[in-house]
Amino acid sequence: MSRGLGDVYKRQVVKLKETKTYLREFYFIPDSVPAYQENDIMMAVSYLDRLAKERDMPLVICIALGSNMGNRGKDGQLATYLDIVSRRRKRCSVAAVGNEANARHHFLGKIQPDMEYESVEVSVEENIPGFFIEMWANAPELYAVSVSSPTGEVLPKVPYRSGGRQEFVFIFEQTRVSIDYRLTGRRQGNQLIYLRFSNAAQGIWTINVYPQSIVTGDYNMWLPMRNFTSGNVFFLRSNPNHTITVPGNAGQVISTGGYNVANGCLYLDSGRGFTLSGEVKPDFCAPAVNVYGPGLRNRFVTMTGTSAAAAITAGACAQIMEWGLVKRNQIFMSSADIKNMLIRGADRADDRSYPNPSWGYGTLDVYGAFEDLRR
């Protein structure tokens, strides 16, 4: 038993096992960086859900993890599963939106009808063993790509074919590039183009994107998250929007951005929305800069990042669940009920428009949420 978030609550921590070695090697993730598989995270959530059911207790799940990989639409496996769990009575899920807004790891593409192709430039520093890029386009858009090396050698346009794959080794750079085309998801059929650069040479790499069948001409590219590459890799013309990490894009999950309480300013690295489907994310922002709290080995530490904001938000959700379910003020309560309650009570500045891609519906205000119930 612990005290602090509510009068009395029980804390359950699930330790995830590290990802398999062959996956680290495939995605070029350094050994020193913690990384976990999506299916293991889903198993952890399932375990907590079963445990809460056995004990007939409300459950707040805090996920302070994120990824730039995977489907950003409604077909992502982890996001879909969290939505299912969050719809259940006495369940609430909170996720951080990530710290990728200023990492220059997102490119927002737009091909006009009169354009033959659009060029996307990627800067790669020296001694990079490899990296990958995921390009996503919502159905019915279809694209094909070609790649130019820093010395000007060109991998010609690889024609689109679902399930098609091509590999090419650049002569001077000795960089191996593989390109895979996929149509993903059970409901949407969005296009994924996966580009993997092995033994990546230093310099500016150019990816030319060719329209095959377009309506809007919109597409997005993402590089791996910070620390998931062994050096600095970024888009020269990056875009800070649509940088919410998975599963912060899940519809039923309470997605928390971050801000600095000391000056009221946005935490600049806080992931920004909206989602690719236009859904408002983040839902709101919580303190994320120099947050003081318990750490390992019975010590208190200072933390910065949206993971800290998610932890604070999870505590607020526990307070609301205690008020509603334990004290029986609102016995039918789910993640959506808590989210709407916090959104209605959020503090909103007069000089900003809402909903906002950076701030969502404002900043977390638990007192304001309860005050709103009195009106």
Kindly give the residue locations of the regions a language model identified:
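Noncatalytic modules at the cell exterior or secretory-pathway interfaces
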Residues: 197-213
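Extracellular S/T/G-rich loop segment that most often corresponds to the catalytic His/Ser-adjacent loop
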Residues: 103-192, 209-210, 236-318
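Short acidic, glycine-rich surface-loop motifs adjacent to enzyme active sites
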Residues: 14-15, 45-73, 96-97, 212
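Catalytic cores of secreted or luminal carbohydrate-active enzymes
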Residues: 61, 78-108, 364-366
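Single conserved hydrophobic/aromatic residue that forms the stacking wall/gate
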Residues: 1-9
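C-terminal subdomain of the subtilisin-like protease fold in secreted/lumenal serine endopeptidases
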Residues: 22, 29, 58-60, 65, ...
